């Protein structure tokens, strides 16, 4: 758990230092079982989980020329992941597949992504550009981004481990909130309302000493502090339930949390199935 907290602290620190980039909207064509495409780490909004990534956050900010003779028709013409805007012979904007070789060179390992066919791509830009060239094919239809980071061996999730996953997830979300609270001195990592809720969690963090406790004691503690236990889950749910806000989480909405967790927690894929 200490390693996870250290990892989260590093991500939160990097989120504060990173320049804000423009986010891309979700890809329009998504198979129900596929995961939404995920990318480079953008600046984390106030009150957001630093491990949760934004869909399309790998997009490079479009450069603008200092001297613009006429408005570029492509300026406000959106293209989905893997495509770029070009003008046809009538000066009409159109979306075409991006050449993978035109993608920016990766800075480090953290930019690499793994596809569901276990192939590592240098960045999400390279992945989406490659997927675009396969549009209309069976392979392209099935291909999607699986998780962030280079492909690695992920051991199978045992039934006993899967049954414990919700508790690990709840505790992990709680630890994320507590870590953000402890580092929130003027950094605006949490909203004022969130700070008040997490303050209670922080103050009660050590009400039970580590060790084995009777089930009855743990049950009473859970009932007494129910709101404290469920707030981290509600906090994360509220961040993900956005498109649309309907009280349900689709595979697309879960993707920003799922993709960065898979390399760290091998039961993630099975839990979110």
UniProtKB/Swiss-Prot annotation:
CDD domains: FSL_SPARC. Residues 73-95 form the Follistatin-like domain. Detected in chondrocytes. Its main location: secreted. SUPFAM superfamilies: EF-hand, EGF/Laminin, Kazal-type serine protease inhibitors. Appears to regulate cell growth through interactions with the extracellular matrix and cytokines. Binds calcium and copper, several types of collagen, albumin, thrombospondin, PDGF and cell membranes. There are two calcium binding sites; an acidic domain that binds 5 to 8 Ca(2+) with a low affinity and an EF-hand loop that binds a Ca(2+) ion with a high affinity. This is SPARC.
